[in-house]
Regions:
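N-terminal, positively charged regions that mediate nucleic acid binding
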Residues: 1-40, 419, 425-428
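Short, charge-patterned binding micro-sites
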Residues: 40-58, 324-328
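Internal helix-turn-beta structural module
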Residues: 46, 313-315, 322-428
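Alpha-helical support elements that line or immediately flank enzyme active sites
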Residues: 12-31, 126-150, 287-311
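Conserved phosphate/anionic-ligand binding catalytic regions in large, soluble enzymes, centered on
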Residues: 8-10, 14-19, 115-130, 253-278, ...
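C-terminal catalytic subdomain
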Residues: 268, 273-317, 328-335
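Glycine-rich, mobile lid/loop segments that gate access to catalytic sites or pores
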Residues: 6, 66, 73-254, 380, ...
Length: 428
């Protein structure tokens, strides 16, 4: 019997994602000016207000007000009617120095003995369901909102009423063998201007007219654009039987941090695999790579993706766990969901993984180049499944004599640079 599976995504203007992006922008500023910075930065955003808190150990001085306002402007909160606007919002900082107790437990004279920044378990997942080895429902949910943001920023005349806050959700029907049959449901909720006024008509009639226009544009503009981005096998899943729920609660004018308070780290499933695989519970944004919540989750994704790409299995979950202050992981666990292509148990695969990939925190940092300012781009539309690329980033501040220019590689954990090593190790 067929079954349904659903994943959601949220836009860069969603309150929790605004908070994530501010936290990661601050992290990037610290790392650009001091690669050894230890950062744990949390952000709260609400009506007209940004609150920053956390612990930092760094030689750099960062203008946190300026960084926060630049992020808010970049997202698109630039109008006073939003009641959360880049120039006028208050920015309060309660960032203070990192605990000496924690720092002593993490830093070592031998960098490869560097202990994990905290205890916990982290997961990586990959599937051959899509070209980027991500679950299809989540990939589609991200794509819908990426395209919606591109329209809002680059082609505003097409859907001129769009505001920054939005959410998506995609449900896919699968057969008994886990093969996608068709897209069952698409949900889009997008914040919008009040672009039809109740002049000569009732407010209810005006609201209904706005909703009909948005639904029409989603079906005839947004979805066809997203469909065209995918290969033929995925395009075939878009049929006339898709159920659409567009702004199902009706008018969505009040949104963003004015509509809902946002906090760093509240969209961890959107950030990872959309409910597929597993999650250890630790958020990513605002944390430097000494925090294994982040770095080990990236490393586990890197392992899972390279294993699936090498043909070890069609679907893989990798778990790694740490104790604070201890470099060597407590365990490496692998689950192939019965879809392994090698004559080995999952335990034997896990043992082999430990031989191929050094999972000590310092080794992860160096292998994936995580001491660079690469994190702002991860803070919206998913940390996983993205395209590795080299970009030039420029950091300006009134507190430094000249701009800091960095050529950095984004999403290094998505590289398929270990496929040959994996194939050799598994005899593939």
């Amino acid at each position: 019997m067929s079954y349904l599976f659903t994943s959601e995504s949220v836009s860069e203007g969603h309150p929790d994602k605004v908070a994530d992006q501010i936290s990661d922008a601050l992290l990037d500023e610290f790392l650009a000016n001091d690669k050894d910075s230890k950062v744990a930065c949390e952000t709260l955003v609400t009506t007209g207000q940004v609150v920053l808190a956390g612990e930092v150990k760094s030689k750099a001085y960062v203008d946190v007000q300026d960084v926060a306002r630049n992020v808010i402007k970049k997202i698109g909160y630039t109008k006073s009617e939003y009641q959360f606007e880049a120039k006028s919002c208050g920015v309060f900082s309660a960032i203070h120095e990192q605990s000496g107790d924690i720092n002593r437990g993490v830093e070592r004279e031998d960098p490869y003995s560097q202990g994990a920044g905290d205890q916990g378990m982290m997961f990586g997942y990959a599937t051959n369901e899509t070209a980027n080895y991500m679950p299809l429902a989540l990939d589609l949910a991200h794509s819908l909102l990426l395209e919606l943001a591109a329209i809002r920023k680059n082609e505003p005349k097409i859907m001129p009423y769009l505001r920054p806050d939005a959410k998506s959700q995609v449900t896919i029907e699968y057969d008994d063998n886990g093969k996608p049959l068709h897209i069952h449901t698409i949900v889009i909720s997008t914040q919008h201007d009040e672009f039809i006024e109740a002049k000569g008509i009732s407010q209810e009639e005006a609201d209904n007219a706005m909703q009909k226009r948005i639904e029409y544009d989603v079906k005839t503009i947004l979805v066809p654009r997203v469909k065209a981005q995918y290969p033929e096998n995925v395009q075939a899943l878009f049929d006339d039987n898709i159920i659409y729920h567009v702004n199902p609660t009706g008018k969505f004018v009040i949104g963003g941090p004015h509509g809902d308070t946002g906090l760093t780290g509240r969209k961890i499933i959107v950030d990872t695999y959309g409910g597929k695989g597993a999650h250890g519970g630790g958020a990513f944004s605002g944390k430097d790579p000494s925090k294994v919540d982040r770095s080990a989750a990236y490393a586990a994704r890197h392992i899972a993706k390279n294993l699936v790409a090498a043909g070890v299995a069609d679907e893989i979950l990798v778990q790694v766990a740490y104790a604070i202050g201890v470099a060597k992981p407590m365990n490496i666990f692998v689950n192939t969901y019965g879809r392994s292509n090698v004559n080995m148990t999952d335990g034997e695969i896990a043992q082999k993984v430990g031989e191929i990939f050094d999972m000590r925190p310092k080794a992860i940092e160096e292998r994936l180049k995580l001491r660079n300012p690469i994190y702002f781009e991860t803070a919206s539309y998913g940390h996983m499944g993205r395209q590795p690329q080299v970009v030039r980033k420029v950091f300006n501040s009134r507190y430094i004599p000249k701009p800091v220019v960095c050529d950095v590689e984004l999403f290094t954990w998505e590289k398929l640079d270990y496929v040959d090593k994996v194939k050799a190790a598994f005899g593939l």
